[in-house]
């Protein structure tokens, strides 16, 4: 396992210097190809973490992961006009909440958005998006062709990250051994193989909001809201949400309150989740229009911001109202049932 060709780049990192986007692409491409020892990988990730990753380094790492990903056939290979939105969080916020972004994906799709949600097994909560979907019989490892058909027919598909990003497995043991956040914690939401034009992206730290918006701009995302909601990696119902909105090539920063979104404040304890089976019951109740007010509102403000970002609603408040009416209609639950059926029709 030779890393001779990237040793000069590693030396730059060990000296506390920054890599260019192209250099970061090269070093992460080597990692994905399995050309890097675990010791070297650990040294690289820690060197980046201690200095603090730059916009170019995060962008270059994302470029490498995107280039190596299994193709999603719906994508036209760039960000031109596919109309797709992703509602995603980095995870790792330390709170064990209900599956807000996953549930919001069904609501946004039922309200007319085209949602390709890129997800993985749980990071911080007891039940990540894929854990929840398995409870409903949705085939997590559906082939790219099946996922594309789901997106065409139902406006919604789920892309299971390990199915598209095989090379990430090389970093698994090192990430577990380091027991600390690394660049990989923010890469997941940036490497959706559907290349969404629009994104609602939640981050685990307020310090990441602006940098990740800048990365999305560098990666060619058309419109996005990067959010951190009072400790959560999503739009908050229990406090203020920091936002960096990317629109027309500009990034503007502001804060949103629940009142701005047209809903009352709630306590974080009102959103506590459980094991996958319990969270599935909660999600089903919300999607049938029978959830608690706090649950429905938490999902609606996130779905609403996604509806705003992709242009279906002209404000976050209008988006939230549309999301709430969609929840009450039960359309989102019908969509869940249809997705379970279509996703499991053609198992590979």
From Swiss-Prot:
Binds 2 magnesium ions per monomer. Keywords: Amino-acid biosynthesis, Aromatic amino acid biosynthesis, Glycosyltransferase, Magnesium, Metal-binding, Transferase, Tryptophan biosynthesis. Its EC number is 2.4.2.18. Its cofactor is Mg(2+). Mg(2+) 1 binds at residues 101, 234. Anthranilate 2 binds at residue 175. It catalyses: N-(5-phospho-beta-D-ribosyl)anthranilate + diphosphate = 5-phospho-alpha-D-ribose 1-diphosphate + anthranilate. GO terms for molecular function: anthranilate phosphoribosyltransferase activity; magnesium ion binding. The keyword Iron-sulfur does not apply. GO terms for cellular component: cytosol. Pathway: Amino-acid biosynthesis; L-tryptophan biosynthesis; L-tryptophan from chorismate: step 2/5. 5-phospho-alpha-D-ribose 1-diphosphate binds at residues 89, 92-93, 97, 99-102, 117-125, 129. InterPro entries: Anthranilate_Pribosyl_Tfrase (IPR005940), Glycosyl_Trfase_fam3 (IPR000312), Glycosyl_Trfase_fam3_N_dom (IPR017459), Glycosyl_Trfase_fam3_N_dom_sf (IPR036320), Nuc_phospho_transferase (IPR035902). It holds the Pfam family Glycos_transf_3. Mg(2+) 2 binds at residues 233-234. Anthranilate 1 binds at residues 89, 120. Homodimer. Catalyzes the transfer of the phosphoribosyl group of 5-phosphorylribose-1-pyrophosphate (PRPP) to anthranilate to yield N-(5'-phosphoribosyl)-anthranilate (PRA). HAMAP family: TrpD. Belongs to the anthranilate phosphoribosyltransferase family. This is Anthranilate phosphoribosyltransferase. It comes from Shewanella sp. (strain W3-18-1).
């Amino acid at each position: 396992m030779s890393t001779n060709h990237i040793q000069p780049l590693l030396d730059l990192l060990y000296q506390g210097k920054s890599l260019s986007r192209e250099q970061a692409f090269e070093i992460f491409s080597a990692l994905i190809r399995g050309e890097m020892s675990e010791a070297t990988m650990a040294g690289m990730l820690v060197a980046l973490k201690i200095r603090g990753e730059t916009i170019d380094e995060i962008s270059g790492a994302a470029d490498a992961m995107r280039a190596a990903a299994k193709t999603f056939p719906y994508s036209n290979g760039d960000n031109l006009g596919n109309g797709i939105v992703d509602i995603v969080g980095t995870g790792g916020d330390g709170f064990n909440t209900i599956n807000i972004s996953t549930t919001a994906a069904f609501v946004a799709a039922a309200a007319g958005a085209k949602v390709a949600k890129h997800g993985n097994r749980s990071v911080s909560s007891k039940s990540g998006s894929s854990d929840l979907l398995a409870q409903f019989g949705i085939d997590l490892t559906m082939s790219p062709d099946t996922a594309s058909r789901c997106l065409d027919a139902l406006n919604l598909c789920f892309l299971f990250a390990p199915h598209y990003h095989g090379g990430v497995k090389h970093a698994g043991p090192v990430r577990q051994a380091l027991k600390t956040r690394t660049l990989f914690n923010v890469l997941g939401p940036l490497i959706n193989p559907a290349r969404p034009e629009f994104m609602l992206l939640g981050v685990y730290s307020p310090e990441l909001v602006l940098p990740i918006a800048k990365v999305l701009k560098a990666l060619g995302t058309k419109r996005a809201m990067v959010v951190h909601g009072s400790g959560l990696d999503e739009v908050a119902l229990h406090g203020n949400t920091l936002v960096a909105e990317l629109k027309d090539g500009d990034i503007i920063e502001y804060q949103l309150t629940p009142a701005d979104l047209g809903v009352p404040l709630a306590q974080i304890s009102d959103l506590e989740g459980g094991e996958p089976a319990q969270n599935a019951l909660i999600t089903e109740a919300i999607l049938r229009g029978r959830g608690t007010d706090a649950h429905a509102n938490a999902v609606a403000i996130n779905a609403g911001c996604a509806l705003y970002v992709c242009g279906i609603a002209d404000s976050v408040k209008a988006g939230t109202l549309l999301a709430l009416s969609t929840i009450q209609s039960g359309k989102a639950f019908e969509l869940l049932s249809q997705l379970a059926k279509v996703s499991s029709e053609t198992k590979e």
